[in-house]
């Protein structure tokens, strides 16, 4: 019954694209200048997302990564965003029914829906960002790959800077959902911040982590950040998409009220320096490179059953530009040294 409803959704999407050029609930685009001019097969990728692609955070970064990869490989691309959890499967299957070659699901929360659809559509590739390392083995048709940035290193990148910059010794972390990948980021953030703080003669603590149980509830992020600020948090990191945007609103408001910027935020997973006055740096994940690996495998006919890793060592992870107006030069130098230690495998050793 659910598959039948998804097929009806696919028909509705097709009619929408014909009538409105793909600009209603979806965003259909040509992937490159030569995508339909060489007489060869045009490959198609579709992304589904429970947050908005205009959220200035996770949703936007993941969408932009797909666009970058599609344009590099001359694929066409489409997205359906801001969907509810009960629409994950139907949205995926709708694209399967329309003949898309690859489904890109940017989050561990889509795992069950991806595995169900992958079983029903053995000829379609499913790329699951932040999918568990053992998820591909659970796909009975071998048509699922996990794209897995190193969660501990993501936390390290943010945590080292937080440890350098905190004055209160108290840090805030806001999560979207209590996912294993989020827990890994929290652990890395906390251990790096405490280690760097200790090197600087400071005692650093992570205040109790709060979860919004959503990636789109910006007001909840604002509420959480306001509470954490009242508890003394002066450096924030998060893993909650639009919820993070709400948190930054609260941080900016607190800084404005104080008359100076003394509470900071570290963005992710794209370089968003300048988006808010409070942002001092960003943890950057090159999701596009991992998506391109998957696209190449689809074209070569050997997609699936693997995990594509993103690390500091292979360039999949990095730190973005630093706000040198807020981060003193000596701390920039120390931060870069810590990043080099992470790449050398000597950090915290």
Which residues does each PLM region occupy?
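A residue-level marker of the well-folded mature domains of exported/periplasmic proteins
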Residues: 20, 28-349
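Sec-dependent N-terminal signal peptides of Gram-positive bacterial secreted proteins and lipoproteins
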Residues: 3-23
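Residue-level detector of alpha-helical hydrophobic segments embedded in or interacting with membranes
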Residues: 2-3, 117
């Amino acid at each position: 019954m659910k598959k039948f409803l998804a097929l009806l959704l696919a028909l509705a999407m097709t009619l929408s694209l014909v009538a409105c050029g793909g600009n209603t609930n979806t965003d259909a685009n040509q992937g490159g200048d030569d995508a339909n001019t060489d007489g060869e097969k045009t490959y198609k990728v579709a992304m589904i997302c429970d947050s908005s692609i205009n959220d200035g955070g996770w949703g936007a970064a993941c969408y932009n990564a797909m666009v970058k990869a599609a344009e590099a490989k001359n694929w066409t691309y489409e997205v359906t965003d801001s969907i509810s959890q009960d629409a994950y499967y139907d949205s995926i299957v709708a694209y399967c029914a329309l003949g898309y070659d690859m489904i890109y699901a940017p989050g561990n929360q889509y795992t069950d829906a991806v595995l169900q659809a992958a079983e029903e559509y053995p000829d379609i590739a499913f790329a699951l960002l932040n999918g568990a390392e053992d998820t591909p083995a659970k796909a009975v048709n071998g048509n699922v790959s996990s794209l897995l940035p190193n969660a501990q290193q993501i936390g390290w990148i943010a945590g080292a800077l937080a440890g350098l910059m905190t004055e209160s010794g108290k840090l805030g972390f806001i999560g979207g959902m209590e996912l294993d990948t989020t827990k890994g980021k929290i652990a890395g953030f906390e251990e790096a911040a405490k280690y760097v703080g200790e090197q600087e003669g400071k005692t650093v603590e992570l205040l109790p982590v709060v979860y919004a149980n959503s990636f789109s509830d910006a007001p909840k992020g604002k509420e959480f950040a306001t509470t954490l600020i009242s508890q003394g948090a002066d450096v924030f990191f998060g893993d909650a998409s639009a919820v993070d945007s709400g948190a930054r609103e609260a941080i900016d408001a607190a800084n404005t009220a104080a008359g100076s910027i003394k509470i900071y935020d570290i963005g992710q997973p794209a370089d968003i320096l300048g988006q808010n006055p409070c942002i001092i740096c960003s943890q950057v994940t090159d999701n596009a490179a991992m998506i391109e690996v998957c696209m190449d495998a689809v074209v070569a006919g050997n997609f699936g059953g693997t995990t594509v890793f993103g690390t500091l060592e292979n360039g999949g992870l990095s730190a973005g530009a630093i706000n040198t107006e807020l981060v003193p030069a000596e701390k920039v130098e120390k931060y870069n040294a810590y990043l080099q230690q992470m790449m050398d495998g000597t950090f915290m050793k």
